[in-house]
């Protein structure tokens, strides 16, 4: 095991029609996640450089396909909350120096303002493109377990956002240990409360891919006033 995409592909082969990520009124199956992610990966495959691709997208199932699609493209992803104060977003982008920005339609205008010469892609359009399996296979052959998987920005003890880089290997070790301790199996259903750009959401994203279980994105109004 050297890549988190192996989890997705293995679970999809066993549970293709099972809902893996759910919202209040929407759900997406393992097969749908796989197909959408590969389409996104194909669109982003020609992005130049090795810098992460920034993601600005809402708290919804499509955002997770954006993350995985970036992984298929051979890049690390870096989620950014489009509702943060603009000066904090500017600091994150300046620190990250992304190779591209992938944004949903609600955040596309913001992404274009931030781009400053780098390509911007609309998530909804990328999900409708055609998969180039040969191109994705070539990218996968060149990936190794120590490749960066994601960069998540914390608030920072000084108040300045700081990016924390995690590799495929580190994430795989963590998730496997977590699942072992918590005794999670394919019959379980996780509840996601954390924003998808927070480190705490990592379990809710990757445990289902590893074990074939499901994760529900709980509406904020259910647990916040």
Briefly describe each language-model feature range.
Residues 1-169, 182-183, 208, 212:
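Carrier-protein-dependent adenylate-forming modules in NRPS/ANL systems
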Residues 162-189, 199-225:
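Conserved AMP-binding/adenylation subdomain of ANL enzymes
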């Amino acid at each position: 095991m050297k890549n988190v995409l192996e989890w997705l592909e293995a679970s999809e082969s066993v549970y293709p029609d099972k809902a893996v990520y759910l919202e209040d009124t929407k759900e997406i199956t393992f097969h749908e996640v796989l197909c959408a992610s590969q389409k996104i990966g194909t669109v982003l495959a020609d992005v130049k450089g090795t810098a992460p691709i920034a993601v600005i997208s809402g708290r919804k199932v499509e955002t997770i396909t954006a993350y995985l699609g970036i992984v298929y493209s051979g890049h690390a992803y870096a989620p950014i909350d489009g509702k943060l104060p603009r000066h904090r977003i500017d600091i994150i982008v300046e620190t990250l120096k992304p190779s591209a920005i992938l944004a949903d339609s609600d955040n596309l205008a913001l992404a274009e303002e931030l781009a400053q010469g780098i390509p911007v892609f609309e998530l909804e359009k990328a999900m409708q493109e055609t998969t180039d399996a040969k191109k994705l296979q070539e990218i996968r052959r060149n990936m190794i377990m120590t490749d960066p998987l994601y960069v998540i920005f914390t608030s920072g003890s000084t108040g300045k956002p700081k990016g924390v880089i995690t590799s495929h290997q580190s994430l795989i070790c963590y998730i496997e240990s977590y699942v072992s301790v918590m005794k999670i199996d394919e019959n379980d259903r996780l509840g996601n409360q954390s924003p998808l750009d927070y480190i705490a959401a990592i379990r809710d994203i990757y445990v289902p891919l590893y074990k074939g279980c499901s994760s529900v994105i709980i509406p904020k109004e259910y647990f916040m006033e």
